Amino acid sequence: MIAHPEPLHIVIAGDRGVLPGLEALVYSTMRHNRDVVWHLLTMDIQVDHADGTGTGYYGISEEEAGWLRKIVTFMDHRSAFIRHDIRELYDRYLAQSVNRETGFTPYTALRLLMDKVLDTDRCLYLDADIIVQGDLRPPYEQWGHADYDYAAYTIPDACDGYGEMVAAVLVFNLDRIRYSGFLERARRYYNRNLYRYPDQMALRDAGDPAPLEETYNYMRDHKLADGKPVVLHFSNCNRYKLYTVPPGEFYRYYPEHKYIKDGLDVIRSVH
């Protein structure tokens, strides 16, 4: 009997607006990784503002999640995709945060609920503005069971030399977190302290991360990169985020990633 590796648990989050980014993330990840269990955190929600107005967000529906699931199972029949509607958990733990008016959507904070959603002992969180170009298991194996609560890339010498932790790619040691209370502290800071980058800074204040290598969160212009970074993070250093422009414009500027569009078209044609 062939022994299969332990599943790689990957968590993503977002509303309907980031679906183009998520499908590119899922496709590019599955091109290089097998035995993956995806966890999508989503919800419908309206955020009420101090001036009496409100902003409504639509979560990714079961039908839309079904399309992401088709991508996953088409590329690897042993992988799976699970949609988690976590509105109840959000209302219970995060809805009264002082950071509701910061301009970030509520979905950025959902990574603070990992210990309440998953029953696994570790997981890898990925933002929706990422393309994966290689194997994600090395950081998952290295830091998922290490003597740290989490691992993240930190920009050297940012923030007056202290370093700025970037929360786009995170390895969580959930087994350790459940007794250390790390995410419980992060939620408390997120709810009470007004931050520029709310959930990211709440995590950093709750505890220092293990050092994730830059190749797993490459934020600079990847057209100028030496070698091939494993994770491309389309931050402000890159021209476009995939989910903020029409896909055609993104792939015209980044023709090296058009294989994603072509691959998704093939999957659509057979389903």
Task: Describe the residue ranges of each PLM region.
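Active-site-proximal specificity loops/subdomain of glycosyltransferases
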Residues: D48-K116
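A glycosyltransferase accessory/donor-loop signature
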Residues: M1-V18, A24-L25, N33-R34, F172-H271
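Short internal beta-strands
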Residues: V37-I45
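Short aromatic/hydrophobic "clamp" motif used to bind/position activated sugar donors
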Residues: C123
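Short, solvent-exposed loop/turn segments at the edges of secondary structure
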Residues: E164-A167, G227
